[in-house]
């Protein structure tokens, strides 16, 4: 079994960035979901669930370490990383509230024009990251702006089984993974507790609960009329009302991940 694909999402709900290699640490892959768009009025986070145009945002790091934002019909914008303790803004992501630095008026204007709504862009420095949901992980674990956990793993074998049941292929990016592994039986990951990739050990914390987000085509931004893959997932991956696909992870320590690395099951 090996690591076959590696992705990060610099802006929450923005486009994926496929990687060949990446540093990984406390908050997951370097630069993953460290930026988030929030309502200007109340600091509430926005996602593609309600704001599909977020999916048009292509974000990357430029040579100077600034965030480069691109979207159809808009001039590219470079956004400096704000100081960790400056221009703090109260924001809400699900049940969590935190104070994080605002990225400034230029980024806010660029995003507000794209979305047709008054919004701000915020950044999560490591020292302002969130605790994980109650009951999961260690007290030392943290997450930036993912829904709850620093890393998400998808097993390619499970995706192929889902494709077989649906009758057509589903893009892996519908599930917003960070790590994709190849060479395991379908849903073998349900039984994993600890894995090793390269020299790093990862704890498998809980299955990922899926939602309507997965019905959005990552290329076109349109929802599938037949509600796939959720419709099929509900027939065999529903537990106590939750639809489960993929596993949430946390890493012990920090290091380097590269596509092709061997994946070992430790427990």
Where on the chain are the PLM-derived regions?
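Metal-cofactor-dependent catalytic cores
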Residues: 1-267
